[in-house]
Design a protein with these regions (language model features):
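Acidic, glycine-rich flexible loop segments
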Residues: 117-158
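Predominantly extracellular/secreted and cell-surface proteins with exposed
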Residues: 80-134
């Protein structure tokens, strides 16, 4: 190998190493947001799909989410207004509100749901923060001995958050909701 070839290869290798350090370094030092970064009032809408959506269509959901301090922890309260079924010109409307309170768990960025620690009754629930996403997981054991896991991933983006909800029963995806919400208050 000539001296010029070796210099060229060495220079290219150094340039590639420098370039990849700019890509890898920020990811390596990125830390999860503190839970209070998610505090606020968010509103928006999304679309729910399930395995029958191809034949029966999707349902539209209006969403209202509040996240704030509660004692030594925090709470997440969400309301879903579901429009679907019935007459397409005048669909059935269902409104569902849930609230969970969380306290710090043993591991960093993991939180236990207050009073939701038995999957046979009210469900086993916990929350975690990873990067810019606050995830709430709820697991329940069904009467037939199966299980259902619901995951609500709330990712902060720009002026609000993206919600990705996934409902899995016995390992099979049942429903997904993809929504965008705007922060409307603190």
């Amino acid at each position: 190998m000539t001296r010029i070839s070796r210099c060229l290869i060495t220079s290219l290798a150094a340039a590639m190493l420098f370039a990849t350090s700019w890509i890898i370094a920020p990811a390596a030092i990125a830390q999860s947001l503190p839970v209070d970064a998610f505090y606020g009032h968010y509103q928006g809408s999304g679309v729910a799909e399930n395995s029958d959506s191809l034949y029966f269509g999707v349902t539209v959901r209006d969403l209202d989410v509040k996240i704030g301090a509660e004692g030594a922890g925090f709470y997440v309260e969400w309301t879903s207004v579901i429009r679907g079924g019935g007459d397409p010109n005048n669909p059935d409307i269902r409104r569902r509100t849930q609230r969970m309170d969380f306290t710090a768990g043993a591991a960093a960025n993991v939180f236990n749901a207050v009073g939701r620690q038995d999957p046979r009754t009210d469900g086993l629930a916990w929350a975690q923060v990873h990067d810019q996403t606050l995830s709430v997981h709820v697991m329940q054991i069904t009467a037939a001995g199966g299980y259902v896991i619901q995951t609500y991933n709330r990712t902060l983006e720009g002026t609000g958050m993206r919600l990705k909800f996934i409902n899995v029963a016995n390992g099979e995806p049942q429903r997904e909701v993809d929504a965008r919400l705007v922060k409307v208050g603190n």
